[in-house]
Amino acid sequence: MAALKDQLIVNLLKEEQVPQNKITVVGVGAVGMACAISILMKDLADELALVDVIEDKLKGEMMDLQHGSLFLKTPKIVSSKDYSVTANSKLVIITAGARQQEGESRLNLVQRNVNIFKFIIPNVVKYSPQCKLLIVSNPVDILTYVAWKISGFPKNRVIGSGCNLDSARFRYLMGERLGVHPLSCHGWVLGEHGDSSVPVWSGVNVAGVSLKSLNPQLGTDADKEQWKDVHKQVVDSAYEVIKLKGYTSWAIGLSVADLAESIMKNLRRVHPISTMIKGLYGIKEDVFLSVPCILGQNGISDVVKVTLTPDEEARLKKSADTLWGIQKELQF
């Protein structure tokens, strides 16, 4: 008696199952899973692989997503602590690492996470030598540098999520003040993801109308409306969310899926993301900071040259010096 499947279905060809648009997420904590669900909801991959060291949690997260397959259009969701499961990925997103504690600066995390990266990155490279690496773990700018050094990849293929979220927070808060959707509020936060990020007030606009042309004091202490508080809120917001719920996840997950979309669909959108900035703004060291980058299928193909005020440029340089001070002490 033939099996039910054979009675029902006539096979016409033996297919080789090589994924065309595979994405891997390393780390299935709150951030990794927020990235995973956001990517699944945007239909960006034909295969999603999850990797972590905690096997029970990993299998549970995979099964939970698989059980939603009817409502998704990603036909294959897999997981393992063995990196062979990640083979042939177009994009590998690293969210693994020690979690930021309440009140802990992102920079304080660094050596703990370098040691984790020394294991992860060579394994990723072994199975997907042509992938783009998207680093999300904090401190993201330093760890993007670490991933670049360990991987041996060209700099266009090693991307830090950087200030994509900082800029999104900035545009949300700006929109709240003005009663306008964040998509129509334009403004860029550049530099270090975190405490020393730089808001570029000269470029802040709605419908091409520069806010600085209406309020020349914008972003300064002399501003009666204290718009610089908007940037202060951006810097403080992660700490506040961590204090309230213990971690951040949803916004960073959505932000990462936004970057993944630009890469997987070769959109060539401009994002404030972390890239090797040596040679720009008088920076002479191998540091990664966020500047507006054109993002597509090859990763970061171009950088947009932003005109900064002398003060903004000085702040960017100071960030670079701070990061280099830490990077040159790293053991790897």
Swiss-Prot record:
CDD domains: LDH_1 (cd05293). The keyword Secreted does not apply. GO terms for molecular function: identical protein binding; kinase binding; L-lactate dehydrogenase activity; lactate dehydrogenase activity; NAD binding. The modification N-acetylalanine is found at residue 2. It is an enzyme of class 1 (oxidoreductase). NAD(+) binds at residues 29-57, 99, 138. This is L-lactate dehydrogenase A chain. It comes from Rattus norvegicus. The gene is Ldha.
